[in-house]
Amino acid sequence: MRKILLTSFVTLSLFHITACHHDSDEQPMAQSTAQSKTATPPIAQVDSHKESLQWLNQAAQDRADIYAPFELNADLSSLSVRQKSMLKLLIEAAEITDQLFWEQSYGEKNALMQKLSTEQQRNFANLNYGPWDRLNGDKPLFTSIGEKPLGAQFYPADMTKEEFEKLNLPDKKGLYSLIRRDGSGQLRLVPYHIAYQSQLSRISDLLKQASALADDPEFAQFLNLRAEALMTDDFQPSDFAWMKMKSNPVELVIGPIETYEDQLFGYRAAYESYVLIKDLSWSKRLEKYASFLPELQKGLPVTDAYKPPMSGTGSDLNAYDVIYYAGHSNAGSKTIAINLPNDEEVQLKMGTRRLQLKNAMKAKFDKILIPIAEQLISPQQLKHVKFYAFFANTMFHEVAHGLGIKNTLAGNSSVRQALKENASAFEEGKADILGLYMVTELFKKGELEEGELMDYYTTFLAGIFRSVRFGASSAHGKANMLRFNYFKERNAFSRNESDGTYSVNFEKFQQAMTELSHDLLTIQGDGDYQKAKEWLETKGVIDSGLQQDLSKLDKANIPVDVYFKQGVDVLGL
């Protein structure tokens, strides 16, 4: 998935099963001798000798209540006693990935928490996994806090882009290693399985214990393979095993998966986990859509070179209730759908799995999207904002990650490597717009039968306003703004100056969708780094007019996103 984040229509969210966001003593890079020799000091850490941190200003403090609480629960009555015991082990393993993500995103958590004097400060820092506001351009929240490093904790604080580009090390762009300085100041790689050896060993043990309790033999095999993968950083065998699973009622996503946290290059993956319960009845309703992927790939509005033969036929769609988020998936905006694995080789051979997170999705629709639509969608079109359209738009965003092109036409790199730090935003933008393209085509074929096409377009526009509130700093935020401004330039929607509400212009909206699909796929296929960078710099921004409209949502006290009450106690385990 790329984490749709939980953004655009996901968050989002979005995510490698090659490794799609609780607390314990954090001591980054202290797990092994090899690690301690190469570790650099944590970036932007708090000096324990300084006075307590205060809110940077009133505006920062006012944002402490932008998240609405939501209890993560699910019907576990069909699970055996063994499976319920297994769930507890999976949640315990997920909690450790939460610790790992703190190390990757910020550094020593306890040092920060000890300098925050109020529960409100600590809670908000916890939601952001650090002292920066993830849904407001990563702005500092507290006094004495500098700008968030683009490379988080993946790179040395003093490393420049130029220094990295000149670095002659194999796999320097790899997903599963840290860049550190050795004793002589030279850059070197430290694999995750060495850097985080202690925590990963514990996770591996927990997964092996859980496998012994699994009723489904394929799930048991996956847990064992994933346990091994975490200790070697070789995730492909477990990815294949994950794709082979079809009947398991319990699902787990765990490991270093998405690269959004690395805003310097977009190379390095961050740890996260999801523990999920499959909704078998809803999943059955979704089965048929996967079979249309090859046909939809052929119909993409670009020349054949930009739409190579469809990836593997093993792709599937399923609906789930999430019972636990941890690490990257729990930071800031919450993902509502996932598309995994990210490994292109696995995708080509077996396709991907699209996980629709039904309970989280319904929470965002009821608590956030409907109130937003009531403020910003014209009264005449408000009737078109529907949950089935929100569900479909979100679902096909994830499906659309599998469409398009993975490697540049020149054949010398992947799209991700060619577009560098712009790759994630373009991938999310592609998934958003191709998802809507798929909705349009399937509706025309009569395969989507609920409502009318205007429902999906109007709900899509309302969803942009929801996701834009996540800010324009994340990959999803930039993708949202690029699309909003592209559509605005083409009069795909109109703004009523008298009341500040928006209306979809149906035909122009559909035309803009087709043109943007073509343009994004072309930039990806060409590996055009400069154009991608230019687009995001000029179109991936929130202008003053839109900002004024979004301020109406703040005045109406509409939550920006949700946070979860979760864990074994909530589940009654």
Predicted regions and their residues:
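C-terminal motif of bacterial Sec signal peptides marking the signal peptidase cleavage site
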Residues: H16-A19
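Bacterial signal peptide processing site
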Residues: H21-S24
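N-terminal helix-rich structural modules
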Residues: P42-F222
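Active-site recognition of the HExxH zinc-binding catalytic motif
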Residues: S80, A392-K406, A431, L436
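Contiguous, non-catalytic segments that form substrate-binding/exosite surfaces or channel walls
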Residues: Y192-L382, K386
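An active-site-proximal "capping" alpha-helix that borders the catalytic cofactor pocket
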Residues: D216, S424-E441
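Post-HEXXH active-site segment of zinc metalloproteases
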Residues: I405-G429
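Long, well-structured alpha-helical subdomains associated
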Residues: L436-E534
